[in-house]
């Protein structure tokens, strides 16, 4: 018998697997007698109890049966219908690797506070009183720290009861869709976060992409869409980096106050990364009638590996939330929540945020300096966020430039990649993110960008 006695598994499991496979493959027929326990033990130089354990497992699962004073015999096990499975073409699309990345959603992976997290984990997390707690809404301690941060840094007054912890924008929006009326019609910024289309379709949400103007989402077009909610990024519109002025903010707030069942969902995307002044106040801080659902995350400020986002719900939506709360519990582990709680409680978060702002601002200035050396390029610098919008003179469609960059090992995108719905007057641009690369990599990548643009303009 070909039984491996030197494998990682216990010997009795090897014996069990050998006979099981032999029976299933028909090498041992119904009624055929197996070697006695003593005979097999002697042949294999193992203990009788080892063979007994294997035979007991085979007997328990119905492969063999014991006949008193006669031994063990193969049972009638029937057979499965023999068919040839058709292969399913479910291969993942090949993920292209790039030497340089101007991706506008990527941050600096080398600057995340890994060492500080290690120290917090070993000294505090496993001893935390919330370590074994289960809270569908997210651990109270973290919600308390977020509440304090929102009041101090973002001017938002709320309570721990209004804060919900989850693993990302998509998960939080799914909760919002469940809570809001089934007749929800959502107005979306166009261009915007294109991946939302899949989420909206999965949740059967009626939506209308609304074009932008110099102040953000066009309010008159939004009103004509007969929406019941608006999803906005007012402090740093993604991906145009447009800042919504106070007049437009008041227009949307007054619209929300004008009828019951109307809400604004504010995604405070990258709002902390403002380099010319203090961070802009969020729409939620102006909300006197509690009609703004506020969403933010720690992806760029701490690390995207945490997958930790949070939401502030208006009071009038809490009752509905508590009704469905057990079905939509937090998807963030207690370990991660306690890590971030202690990170914030110890004052590390504010220091980390200021540190990251300094790092990204230096990269922004390097990229701007490199762009100035290329004739015919005009960069729109909002002095916020983590990418620049770049126009090339004489170019209306940037598809060829992006393709050429990708062929040269540079990850990049263009404005038209982010349109949820095509617009006749849509303006295209090259989008260059500076979060993922260090300063030297930005300079090296820009030397390739310069050559490609000059070649395409010949």
Question: Predicted regions: what is each one?
Answer:
Residues 164, 190-199, 323, 327, ...:
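A generic "structured core" feature
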Residues 1-122, 131, 322, 326-333, ...:
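N-terminal basic, amphipathic alpha-helical segments
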Residues 267-268:
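Walker B catalytic acidic pair
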Residues 294-382:
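PLP-dependent aminotransferase class I/II
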Residues 206, 263, 410-411:
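Residue-level detector of anion-binding/catalytic polar loops
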Residues 130-260, 272, 278-286, 290, ...:
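Conserved core of the PLP fold type I
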Residues 279-298, 319-320, 430:
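Conserved active-site segment immediately N-terminal to the catalytic lysine
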């Amino acid at each position: 018998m070909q039984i491996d006695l030197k494998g990682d598994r216990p010997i009795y499991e090897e014996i069990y697997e050998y006979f099981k496979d032999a029976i299933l493959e028909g090498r041992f027929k119904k009624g055929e007698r197996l070697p006695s326990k003593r005979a097999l033990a002697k042949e294999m130089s193992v203990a009788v109890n080892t063979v007994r354990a294997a035979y007991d497992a085979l007997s328990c699962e119905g492969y063999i049966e014991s006949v008193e004073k006669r031994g063990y015999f193969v049972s009638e096990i029937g057979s499965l219908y023999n068919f040839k499975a058709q292969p399913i073409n479910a291969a993942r699309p090949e993920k292209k690797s790039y030497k340089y990345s101007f991706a506008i959603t990527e941050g600096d992976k080398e600057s995340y506070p890994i060492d500080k997290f290690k120290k917090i984990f070993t000294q505090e997390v496993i001893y935390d009183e919330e370590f074994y707690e289960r809270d569908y809404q997210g651990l109270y301690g973290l919600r308390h720290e977020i509440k304090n941060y929102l009041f101090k840094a973002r001017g938002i007054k709320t309570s721990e009861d209004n804060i919900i912890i989850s693993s990302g924008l998509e998960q939080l929006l799914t909760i919002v869709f469940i809570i809001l009326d089934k007749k929800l019609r959502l107005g979306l910024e166009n261009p915007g976060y294109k991946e939302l289309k899949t989420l909206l379709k999965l949740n059967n949400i009626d939506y209308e992409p609304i074009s932008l103007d110099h102040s953000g989402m066009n309010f008159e077009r939004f009103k004509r869409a007969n929406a019941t909610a608006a999803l906005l990024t007012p402090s740093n519109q993604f991906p145009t980096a447009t800042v919504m002025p106070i007049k437009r903010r008041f227009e949307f707030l007054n619209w929300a106050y004008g009828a019951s069942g109307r809400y604004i969902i504010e995604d405070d995307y990258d709002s902390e990364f403002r380099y010319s002044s203090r961070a802009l106040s969020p729409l939620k801080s102006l909300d006197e009638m509690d009609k703004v659902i506020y969403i933010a995350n720690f992806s760029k400020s701490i690390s995207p590996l945490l997958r930790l986002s949070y939401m502030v719900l208006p009071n009038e939506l809490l009752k509905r939330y508590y009704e469905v709360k057990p079905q939509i519990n937090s998807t963030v582990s207690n370990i991660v929540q306690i890590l971030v709680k202690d990170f914030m409680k110890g004052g590390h978060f504010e220091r980390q945020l200021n540190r990251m702002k300094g790092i990204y601002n230096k990269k922004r200035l390097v990229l701007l300096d490199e762009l100035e050396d290329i004739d015919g390029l005009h960069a729109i610098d909002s002095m916020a966020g983590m990418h620049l919008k770049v126009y090339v003179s004489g170019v209306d469609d940037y598809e060829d430039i992006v393709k050429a960059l990708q062929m040269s090992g540079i990850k990049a995108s263009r404005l038209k990649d982010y349109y949820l719905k095509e617009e006749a007057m849509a303006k295209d641009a090259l989008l260059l993110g500076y979060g993922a690369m260090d300063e030297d990599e930005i300079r090296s990548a820009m030397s390739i960008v310069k050559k490609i643009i000059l070649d395409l303009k010949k």
